[in-house]
Amino acid sequence: MYRKNANFVECEEEVLEYWRRNKSFERSCERSRGREKFTFYDGPPFATGLPHYGHLLSGTIKDTVTRFFYQQGYDVDRRFGWDCHGLPVEYEIDKKLGISSRAEVLEMGIGKYNAECRGIVMKYSSEWEAVVERLGRWVSFRDGYRTMDMTFMESVWNIFKELFSRGLIYRGFRVMPFSTACSTPLSNFESNQNYKDVSDPSVLIAFPLLKPLGGYMLSLVAWTTTPWTLPSNCGLAVNPGFLYGVFEHKEKFYLMHVDRIGEYFKDARILQRVSGRELEGLEYEQPFDYFEEYRKKGFFRVLASGFVTDTDGTGVVHCAPGFGECDYNAFVEKGLIRENDLVPCPVDENGRYTSEVRRYAGRYVKDCDKAILSDIRDKVLMNQRIVHKYPFCWRSDTPLLYKLVPNWFVKVKDHVDSLLRNNEKINWVPPDIKYKRFHNWLENARDWSISRNRFWGTPIPLWVTEDYSDMICIGSVGELEELSGRKIDDIHREFIDGIVIHRNGREYRRVEEVLDCWFESGSMPYAQDHWPFCKESGVDLGSLSVSGGEERNKKLVKENFPAHFIGEGLDQTRGWFYTLHVISSLLFGQPAFLNVVVNGIVLAEDGRKMSKRLRNYPDPSHIFNTYGADSLRMYLISSPVVEAENLKFSEGGVKEVLKTLIIPWYNSLGFYLENRDVEPDGRSLPMDGWITASFDNFAWSLTRKMRKYELSSVLTLALRFIDDLSNWYIRMYRKEIRAGHHAVLGEILKKFSIVMGPFTPFFSEYSYQSLNPGESVHFQEYPVCKNGTHPFEMAKSIIAAVRRLRETNSISLKTPLKSATLMSSSSLYEGIKDYIDAIKTECNVLELLYKEEDRSMFDITVKPNFLSLKKDKATMKKKMKVIQGLTGDQAYSLLSSPLVVDGLEILRDDVLIVKKIRCEGIAQEFGDFSIIIDNTLDEGMVKMKIAREFHSYIQKLRKSAGLRVGDDVVVDIQCPDLKGIVSKYFDISFGSLGALSGRGEYEFDGTLYPVSLYKKL
């Protein structure tokens, strides 16, 4: 595969063709059969839109983890899934057909409407497959699942029936977030996904009492931001523990919380105080009389309830139980209604008033705020605007209303303890999601609304009598066929809504609702395999038992459920992660997944949301076609976005990965391939052991991180190793490798290609096939490596220290140093003795001297380390006093062992020690060792510097001329003195024979000389 001057995008396309031609993914699946299972669940996206960076991110995470565990020796099923039902699809059809109400769908016919939905569900599936393939993700579309397939839907029915048979499904009325654009209620986690800042009315409304209170004919004052709910007012709520004050305003008397009066009426004087408890039961005049008949049921009275707060408003709450959950609960609490009773709720599914509210009938409620306030202007004490957070429909981006609706619920609230226990069994990355966000969501979980008043979805499999007094829950297609006497080929609404079941002389008809699509996606671990109807070996969930069952059942559960790994975005803590967790906990008493990687959001570089309209981000195809998928993958997984943080996407970041990882890797590969045919020399060189140890440490560290699902450090580890390989080993042994010492490099490159397979699948394959044509690199298991420290690492530290001293003292690396003195323990020096020549060469030092370190070489200062001392506050002050009195000798002894003074043990971490070397030269202490350099120059060293500078210039001229490493050149410069100096230190051919390849100018001794570079023919 390897070719010089390769285009990396073309390399990736070549690898794609290799995978297609050899059916590499399919063969990898065949090869792993019979291995221990690693189970992965793929969260289903909708195919009604094109994939974006969020999908590329989650796809990269999923592919990286599953590739890694495949190469760890596991059998990993990788199947793609499609979310086909629900609001996203219906909303697209509503826009396409101009549908704005439920009635229009019914007029059109559910069958025709659902046919339209079915027609667009897989609209972009081919584009999805192309992008997923180009990303390098190995996943099966052929064996994937679709939530609209009857096998999947039948399994969902079975899950529903299991819950129903356990008494976990019930029908009730609840005030819920309601999308008037989509004509359906939303769950609480859906309503939390799209809050916006909006401007709403902020009004004070007077509610006159029917009888005097304390000698005053007065009105209670309530604050509201929803004037449209005033026609449905049914009560006022106060807190029994609050004090309320009577005050006069414009010759009328009013009552509100004593501490809130000054907020709205600055000069008001409190005339009388009364407790909230004393107000309970008082009757008042409501703003509108549309529901006056409810007065005889106890409505239009003051209720005392603890939900009323004094942080804003007036301490008096206008209650419209048809539109406020707390209001509804207060009415239940006071016995005015029973749970699930109907109350006034005169708003239809499109957010328009019904005929019950005659004056505003047919109008959208929020459009009526001004008219309502105008009609009751004599009761309006304040009319202002307020900007506050308000929930919008996540799909239609329209304001939600809170509205009483009939609904089907899963009982979750009673099982919170089980949900929390199972959460403890899950490894979350990052971990704070587990202990904060997800834990808090579970702790406050409410019963789950699972029904939607829509059309394109899995129908709720309940057939009920007209009065709902009896129900039949269907758990399979066969069961419905048996009860109906009909052959069933599809279980969407249009095919089964007309089925009437007759039993014991009664008629049962199906309820109208469909299941929330989140219920479907939460059922995917079972429905993707058509559980419990499928008995296929390898994906056998047919014996998965809600009660545990025999040993064979337990074995199957262990092999196929729960998932070892899932990964999606942070928003899924209230979406897919939650629904998976609820269903598995309720049915099987265990979590649905054991490890989860939670990613954040990919934003534009300016920190704003990526927007096609603003064009504030590069198209993914541009990134693929400019830098390649590998660079994008590594950029994404090396960022905080894989730990639930947001990422400001930078094209420059992708380019940097290409520059710092892929290109040095390619150059190292090329250098080896150009020289591997040279007869091996059989020698062993000092740094062979080091580069082997460096690779082992890299592979060991990477494996350790990945087994903990910590992806973000992969790039750092890879860059550190590729630097060791290209900038140290190859650079230092370039001549030796050309001469035949290439076996170690070849073996390292081969193993590096294998280890990098999950992260850079394209270039890993390209590299591996160039080294070892044949089987895919992705079939190879990871090498077994150990972690350890090689002595050359200390030599590298010494080299870095000398270079740092040069830099801080403005001494060029081309300037030779007369000597560098290493002061350290004898054991440290013994460890680096084999690398003294390498240290001298890398530091451009003529002589490396050694002195064993002792106390007399340093002036010691010491001070307390507060960060360490504060861990034990009982001894902190005493230790600080002791440390401040330590002598230099005592402080020095702390470097090797603890010190006991006045009965207190002082540890090394308790102090900050500064060692200043006693010498007049350039010196610095570096922890385990100290360095002194002698930069005095003699004539020979000056000439050496001149030679190195000219040699460096020639290397740069070669590069700019496009010459390769192995090209022999002749240099022409008409300066005999310079040529004489350079020839003493470097093997450079001078002359003017060959093909002219480059020109330049070089300054020597104040004169500028022309330089020509000729390539030998």
Curated annotation (Swiss-Prot):
Keyword Zinc-finger set for record: no
Catalytic activity: tRNA(Ile) + L-isoleucine + ATP = L-isoleucyl-tRNA(Ile) + AMP + diphosphate
EC number: 6.1.1.5
Residues reported to bind ATP: 612
Motif 'KMSKS' region mapped to chain: 609-613
Cysteine disulfide links: none
Main location: cytoplasm
Gene Ontology BP, a term: isoleucyl-tRNA aminoacylation
Motif ('HIGH' region): 45-55
Protein keywords: Aminoacyl-tRNA synthetase, ATP-binding, Cytoplasm, Ligase, Nucleotide-binding, Protein biosynthesis
Any Pfam family the entry gives: DUF5915
Protein family: Belongs to the class-I aminoacyl-tRNA synthetase family.
Protein name as catalogued: Probable isoleucine--tRNA ligase, cytoplasmic
Organism of provenance: Encephalitozoon cuniculi (strain GB-M1) (Microsporidian parasite)
